[in-house]
Every structure is written in C-alpha cells, then in structure tokens.
C-alpha cells in the first residue's frame, strides 16, 4: 500500500468503499425504500467495520432504513443501540430454530429466502397500514 501511495499517486480507501463502487450500491440505494443486508453473525463488531455497517452508512446518508439478517443475531441492548446509531433499524436471524451448524449451513439459501419473504410481508403490511386513513 505505502509504495503505491508514493510511486503512483494512489489513495488509501476502506475496502467497503471499493465494494460499494463496484456494485453500484449508491445508485441502487437511491431508488430503494429499504435496504436489506446481512452476514453470518450480527454482533457487537457489526457496527464497527463489518460490511453491514458500511452499507448502513451509505443508506443512512440517503435517508434509507436498513434491515440486517444473519445466521446468528446478538440481542444485547448495547449492540442494538449501536446498530440503530449506525442506521440498522431491525435485525432478523435466518435460523429457523436450534440446530447444529452443519444443518444450518446446508439450509442457508432456503432460510435466507424464507426470512426475506417474511420481511417483505411485514413491509407490505406496514405500507398498507400507513396508507389507511386513521379514525
């Protein structure tokens, strides 16, 4: 890194910034109402440098809420507060219940799909409720 800086007028950038650029995440976030991200474990490290925190920073800068999903989710009030501060408004575990890690890993795709379908249903109901006149 240092040699590139000195020899080629390069600049240091956080890895998440490069990933967001390569994925055109800023453009995708601009048209999204809600951003969903995830990783293996949503925990005390998540707000401080893991990929979901970088995505949350981007979404927060555009006024978009972020939902994070993970194979394991820590429900510590301090972690929840830090996640909220980072822009992550809700977390969901994809694990359907207690199971051995190998079993959970083989069901990852199915569990992500089921969790995202449940989140989509929840968002749909919330939209319906918010558009109804209140009495």
Identify what each model region corresponds to.
Residues 1-135:
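N-terminal loops that bind phosphate or other acidic moieties
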